[in-house]
Structure formats: structure tokens, C-alpha cells
């Protein structure tokens, strides 16, 4: 009990003093996770919109595959990407392994299905009358798509927030592809695992407090925008 209390008190001091080590770790986490979220959004939103808006053969199968990928373990993604970017892999000459770029690639693969699936759900919830009204008023296909996209904007924002919340807390991909290098590829989750192994509970708890605060904020934002879709 004393260990927990002492660690918690020391952790609060570290957070309040903006410890350089913590600032560096949080900065790496936000940079890598933020970049992967932007890339996944640029790919996943158009993909999800196309799947929801268009009618084509195999549409149900594509949606099923995306839903299946939502449960894909991070270690599987890490292993898959590692096989491509390791020295013996196809992309070995690019020297991507144990870099932030490798982490971004893995994290993008992780959350791309999340963005696409949530976008599909957001588009599918839009009343069909919006499409029919737009067509009746003489809107072309592009203008109709814009109307649907505008009405689904809150659901799409919720998709991006959910993706960021998923990726900021992952550890498997960051550990396998980043290598947990101090000041370069060490994220909050990998640092917590390392500090726990070293017995440095204060830093681990401090990072846990920050991560918990981020998760709480992300969840509040997610439910806010998700609620907007019901208005």
C-alpha cells in the first residue's frame, strides 16, 4: 500500500513539474498516433463513403471483411509489417524498422478499418429522404454526395476520434516496430511497460495518469459527436 501511495504522489509531482522525460514520451506518442490517424482518415473516410454510397457486387462481403479487421490483434499487424520492413523483407533496403515511420505504418493499418467502418455506419444512418430531395432539386451525383457527407459529418468526426483513441493506447505495434528507443520511438504505453519491468513505478504511474486523462477526454468527445448524429 505504501508503494502505491508513494508512487502515486511521486507521479503527480512528475506530471506537475512537466518532467522532460515525460514530455518527450508524450510528444512522441501524440506525433506518431496523430500522424497515423490523419493518414488513416484520409484513406478510410473516402473508402467508407464509397462503400456506403455506392451499390456494387460484393458490398456485403467487403463490409464483413472490414468488421472482421476491427478485431485484428496488434501483434499480428506488427508481425506482418515486420516481415515486410525487416532487412530480409521486401522493403528492407528502406531501413524503416525501429523508426517512427514503421510505427505509423502499423498504426495506420490498425485503425484504417475503424475509420472506414464508422464512416459507413454514419453514412448509412442518414435518412434516404436527403438523397431523394437533393435529386429532386436537380442535384447531380457529386452534389448529392456532398449533401450526404455534410449530414454525416458528426458521425465521421466521431470515427476519427475513435480511431485516435484506439491507436494512442496500443502497445504491440509500437513495441515490435519501434523498438522503444528513448526519445525517438518510446511511447506512453511502451514506456509504462519498460518502467514496470525496471521497478520504476512513479514514471509508469505518471504516464498512466496522462493516458487515462487523454482516454477520458477522447471518450467525452466521441460521445458528444456521436450524440450529434442522433439530432
Predicted regions and their residues:
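Periplasmic/extracellular loop-to-transmembrane helix junction in inner-membrane transport proteins
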Residues: 1-37, 53-56, 148, 197-200
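Interhelical loop and adjacent transmembrane-helix boundary motif
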Residues: 15-17, 177-220
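Hydrophobic alpha-helical elements at and bordering transmembrane segments
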Residues: 22, 26, 30, 62, ...
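Transmembrane-helix boundary motif in ABC transporter permease subunits
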Residues: 35-66, 128, 141, 148, ...
Amino acid at each position: 500500500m505504501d508503494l502505491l501511495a508513494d508512487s502515486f504522489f511521486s507521479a503527480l509531482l512528475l506530471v506537475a513539474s512537466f518532467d522532460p522525460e515525460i514530455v518527450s514520451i508524450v510528444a512522441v506518442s501524440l506525433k506518431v498516433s496523430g500522424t497515423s490517424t490523419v493518414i488513416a482518415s484520409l484513406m478510410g473516410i473516402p473508402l467508407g463513403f464509397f462503400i456506403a454510397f455506392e451499390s456494387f457486387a460484393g458490398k456485403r462481403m467487403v463490409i464483413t471483411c472490414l468488421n472482421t479487421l476491427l478485431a485484428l490483434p496488434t501483434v499480428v499487424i506488427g508481425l506482418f509489417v515486420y516481415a515486410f520492413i525487416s532487412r530480409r523483407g521486401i522493403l528492407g533496403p528502406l531501413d524503416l524498422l525501429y523508426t517512427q515511420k514503421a510505427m505509423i505504418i502499423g498504426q495506420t493499418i490498425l485503425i484504417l478499418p475503424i475509420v472506414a467502418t464508422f464512416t459507413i455506419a454514419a453514412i448509412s444512418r442518414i435518412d434516404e429522404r436527403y438523397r431523394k430531395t437533393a435529386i429532386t432539386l436537380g442535384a447531380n451525383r457529386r452534389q448529392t454526395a456532398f449533401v450526404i457527407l455534410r449530414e454525416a459529418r458528426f458521425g465521421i468526426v466521431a470515427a476519427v476520434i475513435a480511431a485516435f483513441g484506439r491507436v494512442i493506447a496500443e502497445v504491440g505495434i509500437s513495441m515490435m516496430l519501434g523498438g522503444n528507443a528513448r526519445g525517438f520511438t518510446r511511447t506512453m504505453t511502451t514506456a509504462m511497460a519498460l518502467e514496470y519491468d525496471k521497478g520504476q513505478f512513479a514514471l509508469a504511474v505518471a504516464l498512466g495518469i496522462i493516458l487515462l486523462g487523454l482516454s477520458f477526454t477522447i471518450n467525452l468527445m466521441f460521445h458528444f459527436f456521436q450524440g450529434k448524429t442522433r439530432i
